[in-house]
C-alpha cells in the first residue's frame, strides 16, 4: 500500500471535484473535509466517499453549482435549503449560521433540507468548538432497524456529533439543589 500525504490527497480531491463543475471554494471545503475525516480515521465518511459524490455530480443527482438559501425563521432558528447540492457545503453553512445566531442571541438551531450526504458530524461540531461554543450536529439515515415485534425496518441509526476538545462545564441548578458536572 502506498502512503499519500494529506496535502497531495487534498489537492487531488479538489481537482476531481472541480472537473465535474464544483466551484473552487466548495471544492476546497469538500476536499478538505473528506481528507480531514480520513485523517481522523473515519474512512467511511472520508475520501472513500469521493467516488460516490463524483458519480452523483456527474449524473446530476447532486447539483455542482447549487446556491443554498438561508431562511431565518426566528432569532435563534433558520433553515438552509440546499438546492440539491453538496451536503458538506450546506451543513457547514448551517453551522456558520448557528454560530452567528448563538453569538447574537445565545443559541442557534439550523435545519438543512434539499441536500445530500453531509459527511462526518465532527466536522461541524469542531467548527462550533473553535468558536468557543457548544455544537450539536445530527442527521438522518435510512431505516435499518426492525422494531420489537415488527416485520419491516422502521428506525434509523442517526449519527450525532459532539466535540470535547475544549473543556466543557455543565451546570444545572434546580430549585432544590445545585449540580455541576465537568466533562
Question: What are the residue ranges of the model-derived segments?
Answer:
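Active-site cofactor/substrate anionic-group-binding motifs, chiefly glycine-
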Residues: 45-102
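Glycine-rich, mobile lid/loop segments that gate access to catalytic sites or pores
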Residues: 117-158
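Phosphate/diphosphate-binding glycine-rich loops and adjacent basic-rich segments that engage nucleotide
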Residues: 144-183
